[in-house]
């Protein structure tokens, strides 16, 4: 009788590459990077569609007769805007005659501002000030700053006030023979006797704790006063020095100008200029004292609830050709920590007219229709990869990818996978030994890395017959991994603390530090991914070897008494008893199908960060899926012996 020996043999040729892992190695026909680099999309987006609000003008106003051709946003996004054609936050604050006066108010964790162009040099607003750009700059900056600390904000368009009896509402020729609604101008008649200058003005206004349904913890108030070049300009009638001062309830000066103690400008002009400072005041009763003749009375404010920190995006607001714009919005946002600025690269070219419906702006604002994982000055990202080719400029919020070179991202095996015995050679070298246990990996692997370091490795369990190490020994190995990575992070933190010593209040130094921190985090994450890659390879290798043993067990069961297993994966069979069809039944039942495989691995990576920290990523958590489907094809080598 002729007996033959039949063995399972893993088939590997030159097309396979070897991948070393902790606990086992793999041959694979292909390989791929654990993550691909993502590229941010230019423009604005939001982290959560349910928690944002916008403030705009005709370019976001659905009631505009030319909508949607006049709009720079989609109809869906326009629903989010509080807008009115011709309006702006500053116009509603000051209320110059003949301009749109809109009640801006709303709530949202993320506030987007696309307005401001309606108060620009083209508007030609005078009222004792031919150029309002610096006041607009300070106003917009204050709005962005307070909006970033509040959930809700609202214009308060009527403050309670008490006006002295001797004054009446005044007008000005250079203000369309009217005057601003805020501050209101009150005058005191001193004629016919010019030497009688009238009385000092004393008025009161109250900043409310609530306006309608809006809570007010802090108000933005315009403290306006006249600036005279010399005492003689104001003192033509012998009325002393000019002053206009605001006091709080305790008598403390909070704003204004007092030429009784402060010098005049010394210039040669004979017409005063109005200056307005932006004050942040708590609710309460305030008094205004002014010299005779003129009283500028605060009658409006913007109120903020100051309940939570939030995000602010400011969109450049400029005219098309033929109209003069300013760049106060840009400068205000750039000088406000945490404000993200959206800027055009080309002139504004409208579709509905020269000033409405710009295609570039539509593209920049199209991201407002979506939810992003990360928003930054460099753009927005909604892909799940933790890496991007270029450093994302701050401010940035959400789960922002870190800068990395493509070649530094570890590769994992893919395609046809063949397990081999043994472990990574580096594990056997004492100097580079990372783990205390060689047989480390078992089952489904999920890694959670938190801000303080490794939070824990959570293990799924395989069926008892699957083999492998005990849960207790694996957990000890994972604890060692956690300690080693924690040491890596501690070293990084020590380096960061040293860098902190050279930081004062220099903005560029802070940005440089932020970049160094992100680079350190990127390197640390890449190092951790390298370890995870090795764990994955070992885990798959062990799982596939178990699959081969399961196949061998199935063959033994099918053979019964017809074949004798002489060594793992090898059988002796008598071909006089079991002919070719019999052998095919035993050994080739799975000839064209894959060997049973381990469940797909669902290892995930997700960069967690404080959503309101301008420096971005504060912690790392492994949460973006990498699914690896393993496939093994068995070959049968037949050795004939007499």
From Swiss-Prot:
Q: Which residues are glycosylated?
A: 13, 48, 131, 382
UniProt similarity note: Belongs to the influenza type C/coronaviruses hemagglutinin-esterase family.
For the keyword RNA-binding, the answer is: no
Protein task: Binds to the N-acetyl-9-O-acetylneuraminic acid residues on the cell surface, bringing about the attachment of the virus particle to the cell. Plays a major role in the determination of host range restriction and virulence. Class I viral fusion protein. Responsible for penetration of the virus into the cell cytoplasm by mediating the fusion of the membrane of the endocytosed virus particle with the endosomal membrane. Low pH in endosomes induce an irreversible conformational change in HEF2, releasing the fusion hydrophobic peptide. Several trimers are required to form a competent fusion pore.
Region spans: Fusion domain-1: 2-27
Q: Which GO terms describe its molecular function?
A: host cell surface receptor binding; sialate 4-O-acetylesterase activity; sialate 9-O-acetylesterase activity
Name the segments for region: Esterase domain-1: 28-138
Which cysteines pair up through disulfides? They are: 7-570, 107-152, 127-175, 197-239, 216-303, 224-276, 333-339
Keyword Transmembrane helix set for record: yes
Membrane-spanning ranges = 618-638
Q: Outline the segment boundaries, as ranges, of region: N-acetyl-9-O-acetylneuraminic acid binding.
A: 138-297
Q: What span is annotated as the signal peptide, if there is one?
A: 1
The PTM entry states:
In natural infection, inactive HEF is matured into HEF1 and HEF2 outside the cell by one or more trypsin-like, arginine-specific endoprotease.
E.C. designation(s): 3.1.1.53
Can you state which reaction this protein catalyses?
Answer: N-acetyl-9-O-acetylneuraminate + H2O = N-acetylneuraminate + acetate + H(+); N-acetyl-4-O-acetylneuraminate + H2O = N-acetylneuraminate + acetate + H(+)
Q: On the Extracellular side, which residues? A: 2-617
The subunit field of the Swiss-Prot or TrEMBL record says: Homotrimer of disulfide-linked HEF1-HEF2.
Q: Where is this region: Esterase domain-2?
A: 298-352
Active site residues according to the UniProt entry: 58, 353, 356
* The organism's place on the tree of life at top rank: Viruses
Residues assigned to the Cytoplasmic compartment are 639-642
Q: Where in the cell is it found?
A: Virion membrane; Host cell membrane
Keywords attached to this Swiss-Prot or TrEMBL record, sorted alphabetically, are: Disulfide bond, Fusion of virus membrane with host endosomal membrane, Fusion of virus membrane with host membrane, Glycoprotein, Hemagglutinin, Host cell membrane, Host membrane, Host-virus interaction, Hydrolase, Membrane, Signal, Transmembrane, Transmembrane helix, Viral attachment to host cell, Viral envelope protein, Viral penetration into host cytoplasm, Virion, Virus entry into host cell
One GO term (biological process)? virion attachment to host cell
Enzyme class (EC, first level) = hydrolase
- Recorded protein name is Hemagglutinin-esterase-fusion glycoprotein
């Amino acid at each position: 009788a002729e007996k033959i020996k039949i063995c399972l043999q893993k088939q590997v040729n030159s097309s396979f590459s070897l991948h070393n892992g902790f606990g086992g190695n793999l041959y694979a026909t292909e390989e791929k990077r654990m993550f691909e680099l993502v590229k941010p999309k230019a423009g604005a987006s939001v982290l959560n569609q349910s928690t944002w609000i916008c403030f705009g003008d005709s370019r976001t106003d659905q009631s505009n007769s030319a909508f949607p051709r006049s709009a720079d946003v989609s109809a869906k996004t326009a629903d989010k805007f509080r807008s009115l054609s011709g309006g702006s936050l500053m116009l509603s604050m000051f209320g110059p005659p003949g301009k749109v006066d809109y009640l801006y108010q709303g709530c949202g964790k993320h506030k987007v501002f696309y307005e401001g162009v309606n108060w620009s040099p083209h508007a030609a607003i005078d009222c004792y000030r031919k150029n309002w750009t610096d006041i607009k700059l300070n106003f917009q900056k204050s709005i962005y700053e307070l909006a970033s600390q509040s959930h809700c904000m609202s214009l308060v368009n009527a403050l309670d006030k008490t006006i002295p009896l001797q004054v009446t509402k005044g007008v000005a020729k250079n203000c369309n023979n009217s005057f601003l609604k805020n501050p209101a101008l009150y005058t005191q008649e001193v004629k016919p006797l010019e030497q009688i200058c009238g009385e000092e003005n004393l008025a009161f206004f109250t900043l409310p704790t609530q306006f309608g349904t809006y809570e007010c913890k802090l108000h933005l108030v315009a403290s306006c006063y006249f600036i005279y070049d010399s005492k003689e300009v104001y003192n033509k009638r012998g009325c002393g020095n000019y002053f206009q001062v605001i006091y709080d309830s305790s008598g403390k000066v909070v704003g204004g100008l007092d030429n009784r103690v402060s010098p005049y400008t010394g210039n040669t002009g004979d017409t005063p200029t109005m200056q307005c400072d932006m004050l942040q005041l708590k609710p309460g009763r305030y008094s205004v004292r002014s010299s005779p003749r003129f009283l500028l009375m605060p009658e409006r404010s913007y109120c903020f609830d100051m309940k939570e920190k939030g995000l602010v995006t400011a969109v450049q607001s400029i005219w098309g050709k033929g109209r003069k714009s300013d760049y106060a919005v840009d400068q205000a946002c750039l000088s406000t920590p945490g404000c993200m600025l959206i800027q055009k690269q080309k002139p504004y070219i409208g579709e509905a007219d020269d000033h409405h419906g710009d295609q570039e702006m539509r593209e920049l604002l199209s991201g407002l229709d979506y939810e992003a994982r990360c928003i930054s000055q460099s753009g927005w990202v909604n892909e799940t990869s933790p890496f991007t080719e270029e450093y994302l400029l701050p401010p940035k919020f959400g789960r922002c990818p870190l800068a990395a070179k493509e070649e530094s991202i570890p590769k994992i095996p893919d395609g046809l996978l063949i397990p081999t015995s043994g472990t990574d050679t580096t594990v056997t070298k004492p100097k580079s030994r990372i783990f205390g246990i060689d047989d480390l990996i078992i089952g489904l692997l999920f890694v959670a890395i938190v801000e303080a370091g490794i939070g824990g490795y959570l293990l799924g369990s395989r069926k008892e017959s699957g083999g492998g190490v005990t849960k207790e020994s694996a957990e000890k190995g994972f604890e060692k991994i956690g300690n080693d990575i924690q040491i890596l992070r501690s070293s990084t933190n020590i380096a960061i603390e040293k860098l902190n010593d050279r930081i004062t209040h220099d903005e560029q130094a802070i940005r440089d530090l932020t970049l160094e921190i992100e680079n350190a985090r990127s390197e640390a994450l890449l190092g951790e991914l390298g370890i995870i890659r090795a764990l994955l390879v070992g885990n798959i290798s062990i799982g596939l070897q178990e699959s081969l043993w399961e196949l061998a067990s199935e063959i033994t069961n099918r053979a019964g008494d017809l074949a004798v297993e002489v060594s793992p994966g090898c059988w002796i069979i008598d071909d006089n008893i079991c002919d070719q069809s019999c052998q095919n039944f035993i050994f080739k039942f799975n000839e064209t199908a894959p060997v049973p495989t381990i469940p797909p691995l669902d290892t995930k990576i997700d960069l967690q960060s404080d959503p309101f920290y301008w420096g971005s990523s504060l912690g790392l958590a492994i949460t973006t899926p990498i699914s690896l489907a393993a496939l093994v094809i068995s070959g049968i080598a037949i050795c004939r012996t007499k």
